[in-house]
């Protein structure tokens, strides 16, 4: 692996290898008063974010620092991008100052792959490109699932919400079906994109339902997605109240889930919209477990790209 741009670039063995590596990092750090490993000492990592982020950016920064790398954060709003500098010139500048890896988030689909083409010898990690891909989110979601409910093969994962604008949904569909899960998307018709049947590892390996209540009782995982109003131009549903009634995870719906099933959300959560306030804090909700797994998964990705077989 030279870059991590899309889940589609990984085979099953590589996916499981990253998940296993993440678990090893979790074990290595468990019980340590000082969470510091020498793994990436002397390496320089840049985070280059053209969109806002809390979880992903802080998670990558923590992952790099826990492995003793120098991590430098670049925000588009406070860099020469604000003066009109192109993405290519920004990327070449970071390479020239010694970047071993660039972790980037960009509003345009395909931006990370383009940068990887320009900087072949610098590791590029896609932290989200438009509505296209978010590979480390899918890896941490799968790691969280496996740690809570066991092997993913044969499990039913119901992903509910704004599928149209969700890079998380796309990446999860590819990863989970590669590992043998059944993936069901639930959303209003206006938030289901064309070509969704091709999102899985094989044609027609995912399906769409418009009835949340008919899918929840036998689900092993219910993953709620935020309505991305910032990417919407025009009305996609009549009202927030109607959306919450038909597609929100209410207390009543959560109570219909089978024993041992878990609730996930990539964040940020809109409490009262796609998820009930109390459900968001319920024991079966593993949002904070996802955040914790995110650090270990991103440590695994950085280690694999920057050390690999050297380690």
Swiss-Prot record:
<dbReference type="InterPro" id="IPR006132">
    <property type="entry name" value="Asp/Orn_carbamoyltranf_P-bd"/>
</dbReference>
<comment type="subunit">
    <text>Heterododecamer (2C3:3R2) of six catalytic PyrB chains organized as two trimers (C3), and six regulatory PyrI chains organized as three dimers (R2).</text>
</comment>
<feature type="binding site">
    <location>
        <position position="83"/>
    </location>
    <ligand>
        <name>L-aspartate</name>
    </ligand>
</feature>
<dbReference type="GO" id="GO:0006207">
    <property type="term" value="P:'de novo' pyrimidine nucleobase biosynthetic process"/>
</dbReference>
<dbReference type="Pfam" id="PF02729">
    <property type="entry name" value="OTCace_N"/>
</dbReference>
<protein>
    <recommendedName>
        <fullName>Aspartate carbamoyltransferase catalytic subunit</fullName>
        <ecNumber>2.1.3.2</ecNumber>
    </recommendedName>
</protein>
<dbReference type="GO" id="GO:0016597">
    <property type="term" value="F:amino acid binding"/>
</dbReference>
<dbReference type="InterPro" id="IPR036901">
    <property type="entry name" value="Asp/Orn_carbamoylTrfase_sf"/>
</dbReference>
<feature type="binding site">
    <location>
        <position position="55"/>
    </location>
    <ligand>
        <name>carbamoyl phosphate</name>
    </ligand>
</feature>
<dbReference type="InterPro" id="IPR006130">
    <property type="entry name" value="Asp/Orn_carbamoylTrfase"/>
</dbReference>
<feature type="binding site">
    <location>
        <position position="226"/>
    </location>
    <ligand>
        <name>L-aspartate</name>
    </ligand>
</feature>
<dbReference type="InterPro" id="IPR002082">
    <property type="entry name" value="Asp_carbamoyltransf"/>
</dbReference>
<dbReference type="GO" id="GO:0005829">
    <property type="term" value="C:cytosol"/>
</dbReference>
<comment type="similarity">
    <text>Belongs to the aspartate/ornithine carbamoyltransferase superfamily. ATCase family.</text>
</comment>
<keyword id="KW-0665">Pyrimidine biosynthesis</keyword>
<dbReference type="InterPro" id="IPR006131">
    <property type="entry name" value="Asp_carbamoyltransf_Asp/Orn-bd"/>
</dbReference>
<dbReference type="GO" id="GO:0006520">
    <property type="term" value="P:amino acid metabolic process"/>
</dbReference>
<feature type="binding site">
    <location>
        <position position="105"/>
    </location>
    <ligand>
        <name>carbamoyl phosphate</name>
    </ligand>
</feature>
<dbReference type="Pfam" id="PF00185">
    <property type="entry name" value="OTCace"/>
</dbReference>
<feature type="binding site">
    <location>
        <position position="268"/>
    </location>
    <ligand>
        <name>carbamoyl phosphate</name>
    </ligand>
</feature>
<comment type="pathway">
    <text>Pyrimidine metabolism; UMP biosynthesis via de novo pathway; (S)-dihydroorotate from bicarbonate: step 2/3.</text>
</comment>
<dbReference type="GO" id="GO:0004070">
    <property type="term" value="F:aspartate carbamoyltransferase activity"/>
</dbReference>
<feature type="binding site">
    <location>
        <position position="267"/>
    </location>
    <ligand>
        <name>carbamoyl phosphate</name>
    </ligand>
</feature>
<keyword id="KW-0808">Transferase</keyword>
<feature type="binding site">
    <location>
        <position position="167"/>
    </location>
    <ligand>
        <name>L-aspartate</name>
    </ligand>
</feature>
<comment type="function">
    <text>Catalyzes the condensation of carbamoyl phosphate and aspartate to form carbamoyl aspartate and inorganic phosphate, the committed step in the de novo pyrimidine nucleotide biosynthesis pathway.</text>
</comment>
<feature type="binding site">
    <location>
        <position position="137"/>
    </location>
    <ligand>
        <name>carbamoyl phosphate</name>
    </ligand>
</feature>
<feature type="binding site">
    <location>
        <position position="134"/>
    </location>
    <ligand>
        <name>carbamoyl phosphate</name>
    </ligand>
</feature>
<feature type="binding site">
    <location>
        <position position="56"/>
    </location>
    <ligand>
        <name>carbamoyl phosphate</name>
    </ligand>
</feature>
<dbReference type="GO" id="GO:0044205">
    <property type="term" value="P:'de novo' UMP biosynthetic process"/>
</dbReference>
